[in-house]
Amino acid sequence: MRHWYDQAIIYQIYPKSFQDSNGDGIGDLNGIRKRIPYLKELGVNAVWLNPVFVSPQVDNGYDVSNYFAIDPKMGTMEDMDNLIKEMHGAGIHVIMDFVLNHTSDQHPWFQDAIKNPDSIYRDYYIFAGQNNQRPNNWGSFFGGSVWEKDPAETGQFYFHLFDKRMPDLNWKNPEVRHAMSEIAKYWLEKGIDGLRLDAFIHIAKADLRQNFPVNSKAEEPVVAEPFFANLPQVQKWMRPFCEEIKQDYPDALLLGEAASANVNLAVDYTNKDNHLMDSVITFRYFTEDQSQVDPSFSAQYQPKSLDLVKFKQNQAVWQQTLSGVSKPTLYWNNHDMARIATRIAKNDIQARSLAMLMYLQNGLPIIYYGEELGMKNLEFEDVTQFEDETVKEFIESAKKAGKTSQEALLMVSKTHKLPARGPMPWNNAKNKGFSDGKPWLKGKKVDHANAADEIADSHSMFNFYRKLISLKKEALFEDGGYYLLPTSNDSYVYERNLEDQKALVAVSL
């Protein structure tokens, strides 16, 4: 059975940064509606919206306090209904980002859990430990321990894999699994066409009594990823969730974020016999070249080039292993990493080459907003703009190694995910047409390229992407076989074939 998403070309919209319609400096749903003609001209047939639910915005919407309402900064439910209707009218499907591993600490479930020791919602989260002793030495992805003291002063702690204001849900509890399923079906009933399942690989945790073994005697928390990523229970709990959705909405796309999943796990997650997801987004494509890293200070935010040899190996493995199972996702950047024009491409020609290389392979393209204009990361002027303790630590480390504050700050601007979320440049008007007010995120450099100029220039990056997308829609590039040819390290050549058709895609890097 064919589904619409078998031919999907997805455009990722970071709503806060796409288009502001009311002058508050924050992009919103009505701003997105205004730009539907632009999306149609580009040629995409689906959009993925980063979270637009009610949120305190601790983590830019990934901390949800109400799944059944639109954040007032984004608009209203009526705006959302109109957006869905107008997108569909333009032949564009709508995919929503669904945060299902955790909620905001302001969510009514968590608030009740910490105010009432007998609350049924206490078991919606993971509380453990006693006598003010943490259960284990596991570390959070956002730094520090995964354990935060229970505000109710019970002597226990609650589990948070990300920010302490984003407590993890207890997926062992069938009531939690049912509640999340009901939320998903609510939005699908409203007319959306699919869900990106955020951080689903983390919903299962190992035995909380188990410390992660380390060589050091230090008591610093350690990111014990094997204990909370891709555990077998993930599939056990996600299967009924996915089956229920597919039973009621058989044409809904379920796109899982499986950041650390290897290709064999991707097969498990997307094999149709397993009744799970249709495709997954992995972060395993991009192996960085560590050879130029300065060993005298932290490597975390030092710019690193792409290891092209390992990239080719990774692509060949993912293409061949998933062949006949599911379509891989094809992308160069998203909201969790620096932009391709900053991170990898050395110039405009290389950016185009990389786009062609990636998107004409077998799979589902996901184009990050502004990528089609050659957008780069913003350059921040102050460390406080990052709101990230790891950045402060990196800059101090770099300064001790002889770097100036500005040199270190520039490194972080080129590698951190936040500067990749800058406002979309639409034209040459105030704030590049993004907003009449002060944009929520600014840097000292703004891209010279803007959508209006790019559309008017037949040789622009935008028009290159438009032609590339049109080419991708041909059956040969949608459904054809794939074979990566052996070539030198600085070239990337593959063949696509379908019946009597054949194409050779050759890129010099």
Task: Give residue ranges: language-model regions.
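Active-site-adjacent bridging/hinge elements
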Residues: G155-F159, S326-I344
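Flexible loop/turn segments at secondary-structure boundaries
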Residues: S55-P56, H102-S104, S145, R196, ...
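Acidic/aromatic-lined carbohydrate-recognition and catalytic surfaces
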Residues: R2-K185, E189, H202-V263, K272, ...
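Residue-level marker for buried hydrophobic side chains located in beta-strands
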Residues: V94, L195, Y368-Y369, V505
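Loop/helix patches that line or flank the sugar-binding groove of alpha-linked glycan CAZymes
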Residues: Y5, S216-A218, P226, K236-M238, ...
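Hydrophobic residues within beta-strands of alpha/beta enzymes
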Residues: V47, L195-L197
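Short, solvent-exposed loop/turn segments at secondary-structure boundaries
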Residues: G23-I26, T342-A345, E381
